[in-house]
């Protein structure tokens, strides 16, 4: 029998379908939001209509934007899109057009005169003789931001409550990062802040119809891996089962977002996030509303599209954006040839991790509906069962692991990746599939420093040799649900050893880790290695709680300590 989740037990139209109507056999628009409850404003939330969202930087001052990004004024393309225009962007752009061809025009001076720079998140002012656990506890206040109001023309979106940012170049909240950060907040006793994070995401769902990639205007066209149901489950473990009913309206809207557009699909067709396979099964993919270069990686995307000689640039841009929505930006999973970014085809892939998370969302909706005393619980449970059957039919490789499915070529991937453990994390795997997946993962992905992301070295950051904290936790938690405690412990302890070794040497936690014996930070990708780091902090605390004998609570050796910066 499949395991149920083991822990606690396009916006949607305001008019919900009749309560308790059976969902099976009805159109997607009928079942994405059954029995919708009137949304009750969350305590302390901003309930007035938000100000009109400013256009993204590439649309607000297009000629200036392209000149800055093409001219590579800044090492990181995200840097400029986070700058604050000091006056109306249209006027700034007009002045640029009037001046830029004049002799002696200095683009950098023009930018400095018209924009305010956003500094990176600093986390290096903590005493350097603290142990790892105490260091993480001291990091939380440095990563907290409160932006209930933002200046006019900012790309930042206001949120009603404080929130935790990852660190470094990531000065805003991120959707899927935040679940792993919240695990650590709860473990640190910061349950109020964890609840505030959850309320912020509920606010984003109510305001924009979905949780965007992050709270920036240029992230609104997509989401990220749907972990809102896990956040609700986490908070229910703190406050009790009533949490499920409190967030039921937002859970339903979240589901509506991911299922929107599937009403009229015929077998072999897709719309937005929804794919109807040849046998009529409905599963999901990653998607983005826009098919233009990402503002935060504009030059990178235009160069990638230029290398794809046989494809329209818009298709490449959409797939790059969908890859960003996946959180795995980027990986061989999305590449047609397994190595070249310009062959990216994310929207052709039905990912095992996304569909596992949506199964958990359906199960959580069933649980939340049960608290209302309606039959909708049975309906969502039936939808979850349908998804499980489709996953077993299309995303299970007979070689012994879960994998991604290409719905356009009707082929199943033969690559073992860390995503194969998401069905265990979501509780949808059978005992046999869980055991065989564990065997495959041990043989293909176990490294000296933990769980590898994939077994391919491509230069992309979500491939060999990098290890990522969220994937370590998905693995450890998922394996433990199915009694694979030995492999879970091996992965968890090896990753803790990597975290501790780098911490002892450099007194910081980073976004990703190399998994070789030298315990270095990870590489690859579009930007330099970032420290802070939200999800690493959260997962490290969870692993320390599970495996305290690993000795990762020691303070860095004094001989390894960096000198304190000189006083100004």
UniProtKB/Swiss-Prot annotation:
Belongs to the glycosyl hydrolase 37 family. Its main location: periplasm. It comes from the Bacteria. It catalyses: alpha,alpha-trehalose + H2O = alpha-D-glucose + beta-D-glucose. GO terms for cellular component: periplasmic space. GO terms for molecular function: alpha,alpha-trehalase activity. This is Periplasmic trehalase. The lineage of its organism: Bacteria, Pseudomonadati, Pseudomonadota, Gammaproteobacteria, Lysobacterales. The gene is treA. Provides the cells with the ability to utilize trehalose at high osmolarity by splitting it into glucose molecules that can subsequently be taken up by the phosphotransferase-mediated uptake system. Transmembrane segments: none annotated. The active site is at 329 (proton donor/acceptor), 511 (proton donor/acceptor). PANTHER family: TREHALASE.
């Amino acid at each position: 029998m499949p395991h149920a989740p083991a822990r606690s037990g396009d916006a949607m139209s305001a008019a919900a379908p009749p309560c308790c109507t059976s969902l099976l056999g009805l159109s997607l628009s009928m079942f994405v939001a059954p029995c919708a409850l009137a949304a009750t404003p969350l305590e302390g939330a901003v309930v007035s209509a938000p100000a009109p969202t400013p256009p993204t930087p590439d649309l607000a001052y297009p000629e200036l934007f392209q000149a800055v990004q093409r001219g590579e004024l800044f090492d990181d393309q995200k840097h400029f899109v986070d700058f604050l225009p000091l006056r109306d962007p249209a006027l700034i752009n007009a002045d640029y057009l009037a001046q830029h061809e004049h002799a002696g025009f200095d683009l950098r001076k023009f930018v400095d005169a018209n924009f305010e720079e956003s500094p990176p998140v600093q986390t290096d002012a903590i005493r350097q003789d603290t142990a790892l656990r105490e260091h993480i506890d001291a990091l939380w206040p440095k990563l907290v931001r409160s932006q209930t109001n933002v200046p006019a023309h900012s790309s930042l979106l206001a949120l009603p409550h404080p929130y935790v940012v990852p660190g470094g170049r990531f000065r805003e909240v991120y959707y899927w990062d935040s679940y792993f950060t919240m695990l650590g907040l709860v473990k640190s006793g910061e349950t109020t802040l964890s609840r505030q994070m959850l309320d912020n995401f509920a606010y984003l769902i109510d305001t924009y119809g979905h949780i965007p990639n992050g709270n920036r205007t240029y992230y609104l066209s997509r989401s990220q891996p749907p972990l809102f149901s896990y956040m609700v489950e986490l908070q229910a473990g703190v406050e009790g089962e009533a949490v499920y009913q409190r967030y039921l309206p937002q859970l339903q809207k979240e589901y509506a977002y991911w299922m929107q557009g599937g009403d009229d699909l015929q077998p072999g067709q897709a719309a937005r996030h929804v794919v109807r396979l040849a046998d009529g099964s409905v599963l999901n993919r990653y998607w983005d509303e826009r098919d233009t270069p990402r503002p935060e990686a504009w030059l990178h995307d235009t160069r990638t599209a230029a290398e794809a000689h046989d494809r329209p640039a818009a298709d490449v841009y959409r797939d790059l954006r969908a890859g960003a929505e996946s959180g795995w930006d980027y990986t061989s999973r999305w590449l047609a040839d397994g190595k070249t970014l310009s062959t990216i085809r994310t929207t052709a892939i039905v990912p095992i991790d996304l569909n596992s998370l949506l199964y958990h969302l359906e199960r959580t909706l069933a649980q939340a509906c049960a608290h209302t005393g309606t039959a909708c619980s049975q309906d969502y449970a039936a939808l979850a069962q349908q998804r499980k059957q489709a996953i077993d039919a299309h995303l299970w490789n007979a070689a012994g692991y879960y994998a991604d499915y290409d719905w356009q070529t009707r082929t199943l991937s033969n690559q073992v990746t860390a995503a194969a453990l998401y069905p265990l994390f979501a509780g949808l795997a059978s005992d046999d599939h869980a055991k065989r997946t564990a065997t495959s993962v041990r043989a293909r992905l176990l490294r000296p420093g933990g769980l590898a992301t994939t077994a391919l070295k491509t230069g992309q950051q979500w491939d060999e040799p990098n290890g990522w904290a969220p994937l370590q936790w998905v693995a450890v938690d998922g394996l433990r649900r199915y009694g694979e405690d030995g492999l879970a412990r091996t992965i968890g302890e090896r990753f803790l050893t990597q975290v501790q070794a780098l911490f002892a040497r450099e007194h910081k936690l980073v976004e990703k880790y190399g998994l070789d014996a030298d315990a270095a930070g990870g590489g690859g990708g579009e930007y330099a290695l970032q420290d802070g780091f939200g999800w690493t902090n959260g997962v490290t605390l969870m692993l320390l709680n599970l495996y305290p004998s690993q000795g990762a609570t020691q303070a860095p050796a004094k001989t390894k300590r960096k000198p304190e910066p000189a006083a100004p």
